[in-house]
Amino acid sequence: MLPLAVILSELQEPKTIVPVLSSLRSGSPVWSNISGPDQKHLVSRTLNLTRSSIQFRRWFGINVIRVLADNYKIMAGDGSQIIGQLLKLLEQCNQFTSAVYFKSLVECIDHVCDSIRGKPTMTRELLTPNLPAIIGLYLEKFSHDPAYLVSRLAPYIRAHPTTFRPFGNKLRSKIMETILSPAFSNFPDSSKDIFCNTLSTLCAVEKIEPEERWSSDLFSLIGELSNTLEIYGEFLNFEDDAELGKLLKKIPRSSSGESEFPSLSIDINDPSSFYSLPERLDILLRLIRGYLSAPTSFVAKVPLGIIALVVEAVLSINSRFIPFKREIRDESTKQIIRNTLQCAHSSALGLLKVLPSIFRGSLVPYMRRILGLLETLIPMKKKSLDTDQIVANEQFICLVLDCVACNISLVSYYQDSTGLVRLIDAAMAIVQPRSSSNTSSNTANTISSNGKKKKKQASVPLADVLSHQHLFNISVSESTTNHVQSFVNTLISCADLPSAQHNKVCKFVIVEAVKASHHIQEGTVPKQLRNLLVNAVLHPGFETTSILPIVCSILKEDELLSVFRNPRFPPVLKAVEVKEEEEEEEEEEESEEEPEEAEEAEEVVNGSRTEREVAPETKEVEPENKRRKIEIPEAVSVEPQVSEPQISTSLQHSISNQPEPAEPKNLRAPEPVKQANNPKLTEPSAAKDLREDFSDDSDFEMPEIDVDSDDE
């Protein structure tokens, strides 16, 4: 970073601009401790550069002002002086001013306005008073660089429509004058689009109902287009195509008011006059596209159905289906008319190409009919493709393929793939290797000759053609290959192609993959080709073969393809026996229940369960066989009043389940348990006798069992 003293000295005698601009940028340490006098000194030195008579110094000062405009303090203190000096420089520009200097000055003025716009106080004090002068100077210098100044005026129309209102008609007349000039056809497409888009934004300066002005302008353009299409009726028999007549009647006519477009003059004896017709159609279609694509600050209703009718009407005028009139007999005149029709079709395709990106799913109802019209644009020779015409009109075919891809991409699956057969064949035809016509004709003449050589020297170049014919092939341009790749990429992911066409597509993909193998050494594969290869693997169609090995050899580090090459399944779960888990759970439950049962057993032994036990009425000793029967669970369930047998049964169960039970210190219950289990009942009648004994209505009472007694 340069210190402030060095910057001031450099502004006095400028030599290199980059270090100065980098040191003055926003956030630089220079601004952290700059004083007020130093700031005034910096601004005055910069303004002195802009007042120099040397153009380089003025250009140097303009670029420094552009950097200083990011500083709020400088613009708040000296903004009015800076803007005034810039407007003086713009006023001094003339036809001898260099384009670099002029563009730098205009960009600096726009940057200063952008830095002020949005700040209420600065906008009120600096920008609003100077806006009329800025717009007026832009219109005054309009002839210096029309396309550039129109692009710079568009933001002022959107941001300041009220201030721009007095200049709206003047700008509109200048734009229309440029559009209707003969030189407009030589402008690049980007410049043409700028003029058309800016003209559509002028509707925002209307004081009342700008949306109505927008709609009326659009319908007037559509009516003018309909009138222009009827001129082709002077050369072609529209009466032979009833559908075309219906289409033209559905398109609204222009109003009876005076049109902004002058009438066309076409002389049948002057072939060059025919090209004014497609030029007028191109202007109208570009203007319609500008009205549809340019952003507006108001809500506008778009007649999408009429727009679709306009495109359909232009594409339906085709000399393949509509014959020429008898008056048109000259073959050269017919060929010129065919060429003008193709130019008109190209303009309509330009409008059709942008519609999917604007209206999306609203175009789906018109998609099938549009694709049918696009298929008719492919040159045919009887029932087969005219490959020579397809190759000769390579750019037009690429535009058709782009429109097809844009419309098919609106849906996730397109069912009617039979209508795409011609389009696929045409796409494959323009990417095939070609040989020049001169070499092919020379080769044919050589083969048809009788072997007589007039001169030995004449056969030298022909020998190269015969032995190394591949060196004379014309390579397909990269742009054409990209168009076809994009078209194929959309088709294989949205439609199931017929077997023959799918094989052609796969062959094309494999050839492109092999051609791209040299990119492996460079480490990069084009993104579009990468997507095409991946989609070709993901959508194999009805074929049993796969190009996965070839694609994997090229895209080795692709994560998606690595899943197909080395499938990674989820980790295998270990099988666990449920029985073991249940046994462990039972053991845990038993271990938790053992202390409780031990406490219950201790209470039973010590006679502490007085609350749960039912005291018997008598203390008679029960016979031995009766005591054994009480331990059976079935007998216990019969008498709900007796709870003592249930307690003894649970105690027995808890003790018998343990292999080596740990006896409590004062627990002496195991002895009566062993005595009760000593005799075994093997007869089934024992259980029956037990039930009969319990069901007997005798006066037998349950004696109290004294577990504390010592049998020994």
Curated annotation (Swiss-Prot):
**Which residue stretches does the UniProt record annotate as biased composition, category Basic and acidic residues?**
609-625
**Protein keywords:** Nucleus, Ribosome biogenesis, rRNA processing
According to the record, the residues making up region (Disordered) are 435-456, 575-712
Q: Where in the cell is it found?
A: Nucleus
Q: Which domain of life is it from?
A: Eukaryota
Instruction: State what protein this is by name.
Output: Pre-rRNA-processing protein RIX1
Provenance organism: Meyerozyma guilliermondii (strain ATCC 6260 / CBS 566 / DSM 6381 / JCM 1539 / NBRC 10279 / NRRL Y-324)
Query: Record's Gene Ontology CC terms?
Result: nucleus
The similarity comment for this entry is:
Belongs to the RIX1/PELP1 family.
State where composition is biased (Acidic residues): 579-603, 694-712
Function description: Component of the RIX1 complex required for processing of ITS2 sequences from 35S pre-rRNA and the nucleoplasmic transit of the pre-60S ribosomal subunits. Regulates pre-60S association of the critical remodeling factor MDN1.
Question: How would you summarize the oligomeric state and partners of this protein?
Answer: Component of the RIX1 complex, composed of IPI1, RIX1/IPI2 and IPI3 in a 1:2:2 stoichiometry. The complex interacts (via RIX1) with MDN1 (via its hexameric AAA ATPase ring) and the pre-60S ribosome particles.
Disulfide connectivity for this sequence is none
Residue ranges, compositional bias (Polar residues): 643-659
Indicate, by first and last residue, each region the UniProt record lists as having compositional bias (Low complexity).
435-450
| GO biological-process terms attached to the record | rRNA processing
